[in-house]
Structure formats: structure tokens, C-alpha cells
């Protein structure tokens, strides 16, 4: 048998087993299989860089589901792939070329630049794939996809043409969200909003004859250069006499009308607003209804154009200052008020978004909104957690046409050709070559230079990756997919649009369930500077604080979204190097609550590294003790002996208990995974292996295994049961921690090589032997409940646990060293069932606590000083030597003195009115928390002293 090293070497084991799985093609799906199917398409990571912790979480959760279903007997397909990420990738490559070659994108032809992007894509994609493999992801790598590969490109062109032919795609002049930095339009969902402190400027606009002025309020002085009207409410009596008259627009000397419109809020500003149809969404609608001129004053790169008069060439920000300054010089600036303004920001470049009149391609959404609502309302698509439904419906209620064209070079070129002489003559073509008309007269036609929104191709991902528009065997077998797992931040960007496209193309939503994970937050630490600023701590300090080093009083902390500037990013690959893949996966699984925010504590990785060590050591103990011990090798369990099965007549309380708890845990973990409660599944598996199996059952079994008590038959029965529980436990944990469990599975399989179940063997032995006949843990059957949960046995064992807990608690309170053995008295009534159980199971209790002897009595013993604990009607006493009592009193008195000094200092500080007035609120709050904590600790010390004689 392979000798288990004392230490668990994660890196060595990780590399070994991933290569094994890959070589055996365990991840490759068979579309001709008769098994039930389970399919997931990966949310394709962008080919812009490396994976972050959000990717690690989403992909770990998907891999857990795939591995679980594979072990349950499903034909599983997990489709991997990457996304071309139009804007993001183009920006990254542009920056790279400026840095490495000193050239801008416009210094290249389109074809030259795209060659550089494809080179970047290949390198980045290879790096991402290797990182996904390091996470242990069991994707079907034979079906690796890219959103711009040949089949996906065909799918995109086919979908565009289908929508175009059905009249659902149109091109028109429309006010779009314009990013001046990337010089492209953005969809509404790609704009983030921030509240920024700004101003409300009050200007005087003169009437045509300058007989009087009308006062208007605006947050965008620079756009007045494009004003084509001013508007008032038709119900506002103050201005009814002005409706129909004309204003002479200051600075531009242009006559514009005063109009009445119900959209005007009489309570805002002066009740009169400027109308700039080409640069404001609300004004755009007013401009359409009143047939106003649309004057664009901005160039694509965010500067004032020729329509802005002498302000031409200024940026929008510069123009704002210049307009305000000139209005002030002319005596037309009345006043300026502070105003909180909601500003749109590009989700990619972080540039301020400008409303911009532009010719773009759109998908009509009116016809889709009803269906999008219905599929969620009628349960065809479940959003999990369900609280996301209200957010989803709110988005549908405010749905506007989807702008799908982008002014970029990298992406799916819009499959439209225009006739050079007549732009209204156009061809929509889905083929991979050129339309016949273009082939025959190439000089007469030109293709649209824009590309499609990245999310257009991503919306086809669940079926384009399966071969659509071709009717492939994969599409027939695996569509619709089984579930989509992704972050809630792309519910509208991606999830809703996949539902839309899947239902439109295939008359069926692409998945019945969507599990939306929360966003990962990290702990930020900072110091308050004297000028009121914030200085984040360095990386070493952050790591120390994350791992539990006490935080100084001057350092503050809170959970925030991970960002480089805050220094709270946790790199998943660094965590893998430090703690091992299985530890990282289990930490992520245990953190994957159904909350909107997931606070990721770095100590969780250390916690689960300790757990993987516990799995290793627990399994090592079991396997070593199958060969007996150094004194007696005849205790060895043979394959033939194991085949005989368990002898239920020899079962002790702990045997029945561990099987009951095993059945309960197996059933519970399956239920949790079925309901996407990954944190609960991880905690159940963790508690079972560490607490129930190792801390209790293995410890209780040791005296029998070591030959100190029991018969040879009882010892053999214990060995068999240890194997059975270990075999189920490592398979139970495998989807969460696949590497260590695969290693242990093969060692156990080798140890019991040739084992065959006899027909009369018990179901536990048969199930174990069947599992060990599998070629890998990856494809072994996942545990399901095969026995009963024995509540009576669990109740009796719970009593033993409470007695053990009470004894350990007393020892801990009295600071008894682990090597100090004491007597234990358990006192109660002879007719009390709990007293009787305690007397019956003295041997079990002795195996779990360090004692000289355990005495179960009906009368209190006559002893000197003893510490006492109570559980129900039982009294548990530990006699203690007088010397130990003196030491404990001295220690507690010193601790009390120390706490009283700290308490006095805190009280003096908080009673100092000058300190309270000057200190920031978060500092006084922290001091108050310390005060409460110190008072609580002092109370506990005094209570302990009162119990001592």
C-alpha cells in the first residue's frame, strides 16, 4: 500500500490529479449518452488579463455542481470559454501599444491593430485557461469556445439577420450614452451613476426685444450653446403670458421659442428650463414632440464643435467654466447654488457620459418585455435568491430599446453593407463570405464600420456554444442548459438578454434556474491623516491584520468592494500557492452565502488549510490502523475480511451514532447543494469530518484499535466501520475539495484491492465496495442516505457530548494543562435515565477527556475544593489541588487589576468633552465599544473569583 506522508503536500497532489483526470478525458461529455443531462455554460471571462477572486468564486461553485452531478450519474457538460470584451480589450491593447511601441491605435490600419489584439487574446486566453485548471475546474476542454470564434461569429450574424428580417433591429438618429474617452455609444446598463456635488446656475435669458429677462436654472451651462427652446409648465400662471414669444439666446445670438410642456416641473429652479434636444434625454423627447431643431455641439472626443461658436475646441468642462465666466461678465449670471447632481459614468473607462445625438443600431425591446416578465413570473426561469425578482421586474418596467452598435474596431463587425451612392440601399448578410452584390461590384459597397455590443454575442452563449445555428447533437442533448451561475451585477447586462435571445431563437429559455452570487468584499484598513484624508495601510500590515494580528487603535477598518486603491484585493492564485487549491475552494464554498455581499475573510483560507490537514491526518490514522499496530500485526484488516461486512450485533453506541449522523449529513449536504446553499453544505461536511468523525468517533475507537479494550471481533468491526465512514466522507467532500479526496480515494482503493462484496453483506459495505470499484473518485457514486437516522441514539450520544463539554469547559476555566489528569464525579439520581446512560458509557467518556478515573455516584463525594458544572439533573465535579486554586486566584486578581486600570483610562477619555468634540465619530464609537468590552471582561473575572473559596 502507498505510504501516506506525515504532511499533506497540496501542490504536488494538485498537479498529479488534474493531469490524471485530463488524460482520462473524464471531463468530456458524450452527447449520445442515455444518462440524464446536466449542463452549465461558463460565464466567459474577459481576455483582458487574469482571473480575480470573483471568477474564483463563480467557477468554484459551478465546478462543485458539475462534480456533484457527475457523481450522481448525470452526463455532465461544462462548456468553457472566453469573451472578447470589446471596449475593455481594445482599451488594454491600446495602452499596451502606447507603452511598448509608442503608437496610438489610429497610427495603425484597422487590420494591423486587430492583429495585435488577436495576439493579445491568444496569450491572455492561454493564461486564463491555465488559471481555471489550477482552480480544479472540470470543464470539457475539447469544447473550448471564444465569443469571436468561427461558430460564434456565424451565430451572431445569423441572429442579427433574423432580428433585422423580423423588423426588430433598426438604425436611427438617437440620443445615446456617449463615452468620449473610448468614443463609442454605451447601452443604458453600461452606465453607472454617482452622486457628485455640483452647482445650479441661474442665468438671465433676454426676450427678443430685450424688454425683459426670463430666469432659468441649469446644471449644464455648457450645453446652452445648443439650446433650441426654453420651456415652462402650461399650468404655471407666472409664465402663461410668455408662451409663444421668443428668447435671444445669450452668447449665440440665436432666437429660440418659449414653449409649454407638461414635463416641466414648476418647482425646480425658477420653473423655466432650457431645452437642448441634442444633449439631454428629457429634452430629446420634448424636442421630438415640439419639432425643435437638434443642434449637436460636441465632437466624438468630447470637445465643442463648430456649432459652439468661439468656444470651439474646448472640452466640455472647459466650456462650462468659459460660459459661466462670460455670462457673469455680461451681467447675465444671477446666482449659483450648491446642488447634488447624478452623473453617469462609463462602467469601463470611468469617463463621464455625455448624451450625444448619433446614428446607431438598436434592438426594439417593446415586443420582448412581456415575455421577459412572463418567464420569471410563471416559474420557467427561477432567480435564486428570489429577492432578485423585484429588481428584475423594475428593470423590465423601465426597459428602453437596446443600443447594440459600438464605435470600436475590436468586435463583431455589423453585417450590413451600404451602397456608396445611396446609403438607404443596404444588405444584411449572415454568411462568412461577402454578399453576391458586393462580390460583383465591390467598389459600390461599403460595410458598416461599427461593431456589435459585446453583450449581443454573450447573449447567445448558452446555445451558440452548443453549435447553433446548426442543429447539432450537443444542442439537441444539452439545450436548455441546467443552471446559470453568475454574479448579480450582470443580471441585466447578460442574464436577461440570454433569456431574451434563447426564447426568441429556440422558443425556450436557456436555463430553468439562475443562481446569482453576491459580490466579494475585502477588509480595508486605513489611518486618518491630520488633514482629514485617508491613508490605506501597506500590503504587509493588511495581511497581518487579516490573519488576526491585533489592530492598533489608530487604524480603522470596514468591508468594501475589492479595489487596488484600497489595497483590499485578495489574489486567488496567491492563496492557492499559500494554502492549496482545496483549501481555497472550500473557503470560497463556505463563504458563498445567498447575500448580496460576501465578506471574504483571509483567515478562512487558513481555516480550511487546517481542515485539509485534518482530512489527511484523519485518513492517515484510519489507513495506518487497518494494518494493526507495531505490537500486533494480526489485527490487520484484509480485503477478504472487509468483504464479510459489518456485524451489527457488535455495534456500540458510538457505532450506531456515527452511522446515524453520517446518514443525516449525507442527506443534508445533498439538500443544500440542490438548493444552492453552498456555505451550509461546506459547514455540514466540515463539522462531520472534523467534529463527529475525528474528534469523537476516531478518539473513542482508539482504545479498541490499540488493543486496550474489546475483543478481536470488535476491533475488526471498528476497522471496517472506519473504512466505510471514511469512504463516504471523502466522496461527500470531493466536489468541494477534489484533489486531496482523489488522492485518498486511490490509496484506500489500493489498500482494499480485489475486494468484492458478498451477497449477504450489509448495505454500507456493499455501497463502499461498489464505490471503490470506480476508476476515480471523480466518477465514483456520490453518497446518498442508505440507512436510518436514529434519533434515540443521537440523543444519548448528545448527552455524552454535553458531559464531555462540561468537563472540558471546567478544565479550560481552571487552566488545567492537557497532561493533567483528574478524577471526575458525575452525581445524580439512580432512577434518572441520563445518570444511567452516563454510568453505562464511562469508557466512551474516558476516551474523550483526560481523567484518572470517572466515578458515577448518587451522593456528593467528601472532597476539598472542586469545580462544578451542571447539565440537567446531573452534577459534574472535578476535585482540584489547593496549589492550583492559589495560582488561579493570583492570576484572576492580576487580570482584574489590569482591566480596572484600562477601564478607568477609557472612562476619563470619554468624559473629556474636549476629546469627544474634536474626535471623529468613528473614533468615539470605537472607544465606546472598547469600554463595553472591558466592562464585560471585568464582570466575568469577578464572577469567576466569586466561585473560588
Curated annotation (Swiss-Prot):
Q: What's the domain remark here?
A: ValRS has two distinct active sites: one for aminoacylation and one for editing. The misactivated threonine is translocated from the active site to the editing site.
Which Gene3D superfamilies does the record cross-reference, listed alphabetically? HUPs, Isoleucyl-tRNA Synthetase, Domain 1, Valyl-tRNA synthetase, C-terminal domain, Valyl/Leucyl/Isoleucyl-tRNA synthetase, editing domain
Q: Which residues bind ATP?
A: 564
Q: Which NCBIfam families match?
A: PRK05729.1, valS
Q: What's the stated role of this polypeptide?
A: Catalyzes the attachment of valine to tRNA(Val). As ValRS can inadvertently accommodate and process structurally similar amino acids such as threonine, to avoid such errors, it has a 'posttransfer' editing activity that hydrolyzes mischarged Thr-tRNA(Val) in a tRNA-dependent manner.
Any keyword ATP-binding? yes
Q: Which residues form a coiled coil?
A: 882-949
Map motif 'KMSKS' region onto the chain: 561-565
Would you tell me the Gene Ontology cellular component terms? Answer: cytosol
What family is reported? Answer: Belongs to the class-I aminoacyl-tRNA synthetase family. ValS type 1 subfamily.
Species of origin reads Protochlamydia amoebophila (strain UWE25)
EC number annotated for this UniProt entry: 6.1.1.9
What is the official name of this protein in its record? Valine--tRNA ligase
Amino acid at each position: 500500500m502507498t505510504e501516506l506522508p506525515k504532511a499533506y503536500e497540496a501542490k504536488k497532489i494538485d498537479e498529479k490529479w488534474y493531469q490524471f483526470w485530463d488524460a482520462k478525458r473524464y471531463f468530456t461529455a458524450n452527447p449520445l449518452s442515455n444518462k440524464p443531462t446536466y449542463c452549465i455554460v461558463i460565464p466567459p471571462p474577459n481576455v483582458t488579463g487574469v482571473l480575480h477572486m470573483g471568477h474564483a468564486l463563480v467557477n468554484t461553485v459551478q465546478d462543485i455542481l458539475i462534480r456533484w452531478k457527475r457523481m450522481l450519474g448525470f452526463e455532465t457538460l461544462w462548456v468553457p470559454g472566453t469573451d472578447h470584451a470589446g471596449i475593455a480589450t481594445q482599451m488594454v491593447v491600446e495602452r499596451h501599444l502606447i507603452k511598448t511601441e509608442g503608437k496610438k491605435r489610429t497610427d495603425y490600419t484597422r487590420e494591423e491593430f486587430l492583429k495585435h489584439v488577436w495576439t493579445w487574446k491568444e496569450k491572455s486566453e492561454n493564461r486564463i485557461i491555465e488559471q481555471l485548471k489550477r482552480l480544479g475546474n472540470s470543464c470539457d476542454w475539447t469544447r473550448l469556445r471564444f465569443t469571436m470564434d468561427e461558430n460564434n461569429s456565424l451565430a451572431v450574424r445569423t441572429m442579427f439577420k433574423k432580428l433585422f428580417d423580423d423588423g426588430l433591429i433598426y438604425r436611427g438618429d438617437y440620443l445615446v450614452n456617449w463615452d468620449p474617452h473610448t468614443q463609442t455609444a454605451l447601452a443604458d446598463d453600461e452606465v453607472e451613476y454617482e452622486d457628485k456635488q455640483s452647482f445650479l446656475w441661474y442665468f438671465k435669458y433676454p426676450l427678443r426685444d430685450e424688454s425683459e429677462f426670463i430666469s432659468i436654472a441649469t446644471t449644464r451651462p455648457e450645453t446652452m450653446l445648443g439650446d433650441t427652446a426654453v420651456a415652462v409648465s402650461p399650468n404655471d400662471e407666472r409664465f402663461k403670458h410668455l408662451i409663444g414669444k421668443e428668447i435671444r439666446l445669450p452668447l449665440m445670438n440665436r432666437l429660440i421659442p418659449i414653449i409649454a410642456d407638461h414635463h416641466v416641473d414648476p418647482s425646480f429652479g425658477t420653473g423655466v428650463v432650457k431645452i437642448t434636444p441634442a444633449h439631454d434625454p428629457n429634452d430629446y423627447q420634448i424636442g421630438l414632440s415640439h419639432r425643435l431643431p437638434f443642434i449637436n455641439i460636441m465632437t466624438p472626443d468630447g470637445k465643442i464643435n463648430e456649432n459652439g461658436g468661439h468656444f470651439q475646441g474646448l472640452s466640455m468642462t472647459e466650456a462650462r467654466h468659459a460660459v459661466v465666466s462670460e455670462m457673469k461678465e455680461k451681467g447675465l449670471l444671477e446666482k449659483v447654488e450648491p446642488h447634488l447632481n447624478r452623473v453617469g459614468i462609463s462602467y469601463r473607462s470611468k469617463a463621464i457620459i455625455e448624451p450625444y445625438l448619433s446614428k446607431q443600431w438598436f434592438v426594439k425591446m417593446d415586443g420582448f418585455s412581456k415575455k421577459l416578465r412572463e418567464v420569471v413570473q410563471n416559474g420557467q426561469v427561477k432567480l435564486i435568491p428570489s429577492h432578485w425578482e423585484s429588481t428584475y421586474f423594475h428593470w423590465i418596467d423601465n426597459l428602453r430599446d437596446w443600443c447594440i452598435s459600438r464605435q470600436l474596431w475590436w468586435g463583431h463587425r455589423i453585417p450590413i453593407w451600404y451602397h456608396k451612392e445611396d446609403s438607404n440601399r443596404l444588405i444584411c448578410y449572415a454568411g462568412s463570405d461577402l454578399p453576391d452584390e458586393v462580390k460583383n461590384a465591390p467598389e459600390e459597397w461599403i460595410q458598416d464600420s461599427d461593431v456589435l455590443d459585446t453583450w449581443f454575442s454573450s447573449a447567445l452563449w448558452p446555445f451558440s456554444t452548443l453549435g447553433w445555428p446548426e442543429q447539432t447533437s450537443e444542442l439537441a442533448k444539452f439545450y436548455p442548459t441546467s443552471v446559470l451561475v453568475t454574479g448579480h451585477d450582470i443580471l441585466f447586462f447578460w442574464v436577461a438578454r440570454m433569456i431574451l435571445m434563447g426564447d426568441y431563437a429556440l422558443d425556450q429559455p436557456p436555463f430553468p434556474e439562475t443562481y446569482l452570487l453576491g459580490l466579494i468584499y475585502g477588509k480595508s484598513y486605513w489611518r486618518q491623516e491630520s488633514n482629514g484624508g485617508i491613508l490605506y495601510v501597506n500590503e504587509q500590515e493588511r495581511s497581518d491584520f487579516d490573519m488576526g494580528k491585533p489592530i492598533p487603535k489608530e487604524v480603522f477598518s470596514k468591508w468594501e468592494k475589492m479595489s487596488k486603491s484600497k489595497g483590499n484585493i485578495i489574489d486567488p492564485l496567491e492563496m492557492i500557492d499559500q494554502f492549496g487549491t482545496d483549501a481555497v475552494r472550500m473557503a470560497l464554498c463556505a463563504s458563498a452565502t445567498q447575500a448580496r455581499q460576501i465578506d471574504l475573510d483571509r483567515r478562512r483560507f487558513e481555516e480550511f488549510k487546517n481542515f485539509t490537514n485534518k482530512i489527511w491526518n484523519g485518513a492517515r490514522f484510519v489507513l495506518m490502523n487497518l494494518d494493526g499496530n507495531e505490537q500486533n500485526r494480526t489485527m490487520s484488516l484484509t480485503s477478504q475480511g472487509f468483504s464479510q461486512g459489518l456485524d451489527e450485533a457488535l455495534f456500540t453506541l458510538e457505532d450506531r451514532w456515527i452511522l446515524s449522523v453520517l446518514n443525516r449529513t449525507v442527506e443534508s449536504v445533498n439538500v443544500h447543494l440542490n438548493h444552492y446553499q453552498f456555505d451550509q453544505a461546506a459547514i455540514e461536511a466540515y463539522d462531520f469530518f472534523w467534529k463527529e468523525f475525528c474528534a469523537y468517533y476516531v478518539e473513542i475507537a482508539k482504545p479498541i484499535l490499540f488493543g486496550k479494550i474489546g475483543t478481536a471481533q470488535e476491533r475488526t468491526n471498528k476497522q471496517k466501520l472506519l473504512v466505510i465512514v471514511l469512504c463516504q466522507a471523502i466522496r461527500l467532500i470531493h466536489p468541494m475539495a477534489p484533489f486531496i479526496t482523489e488522492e485518498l480515494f486511490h490509496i484506500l482503493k489500493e489498500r482494499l484491492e480485489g475486494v468484492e462484496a458478498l451477497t449477504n453483506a450489509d448495505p454500507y459495505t456493499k455501497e463502499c465496495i461498489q464505490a471503490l470499484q470506480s476508476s476515480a473518485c471523480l466518477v465514483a457514486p456520490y453518497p446518498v442516505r442508505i440507512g436510518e437516522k436514529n434519533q434515540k441514539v443521537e440523543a444519548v450520544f448528545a448527552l455524552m457530548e454535553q458531559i464531555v463539554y462540561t468537563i472540558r469547559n471546567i478544565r479550560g476555566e481552571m487552566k488545567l494543562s492537557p497532561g493533567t489528569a483528574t478524577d471526575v464525579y458525575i452525581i445524580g439520581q439512580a432512577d434518572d435515565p441520563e445518570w444511567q446512560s452516563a454510568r453505562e458509557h464511562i469508557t466512551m467518556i474516558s476516551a474523550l477527556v483526560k481523567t484518572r478515573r470517572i466515578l458515577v455516584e448518587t451522593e456528593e463525594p467528601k472532597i476539598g475544593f472542586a469545580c462544578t458544572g451542571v447539565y440537567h439533573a446531573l452534577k459534574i465535579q472535578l476535585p482540584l489541588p489547593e496549589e492550583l486554586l492559589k495560582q488561579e486566584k493570583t492570576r484572576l486578581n492580576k487580570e482584574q487589576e489590569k482591566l480596572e486600570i484600562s477601564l478607568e483610562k477609557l472612562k476619563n477619555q470619554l468624559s473629556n468633552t474636549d476629546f469627544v468634540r474634536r474626535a471623529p465619530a468613528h473614533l468615539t464609537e470605537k472607544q465606546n465599544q472598547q469600554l463595553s468590552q472591558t466592562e464585560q471582561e471585568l464582570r466575568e473575572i469577578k464572577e469567576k473569583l466569586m466561585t473560588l473559596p
